[in-house]
């Protein structure tokens, strides 16, 4: 599952060769809902698609369960950050569909002759900043 506020997950999938990321999610409204709240989840999918050169198909729940409202707004975005389908409704079941040519994602990662989203990464510079080895787990 791709959590919309954890960009590392989309990047890891892209580095491992993903061309499309399917995100079955539970985007929930904030305790103090904002009028533009739905736009944030859509924007995150657009940005992550563009940054990683992947399609993202995010399917969210609708309605309310145990007093918790869900945002709905399922969306499909293209590898250059283009919205392809959606956003779907917040309170009605809908099916959204988009044609996803996976070769478009492969081309999108290669932005120019000298710029490649995946192979230009310099993990030798920032690996230690990721902190994976230094996480203290209390359990």
Describe the residue ranges of each PLM region.
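C-terminal beta-strand edge segments of enzyme domains
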Residues: 55-139
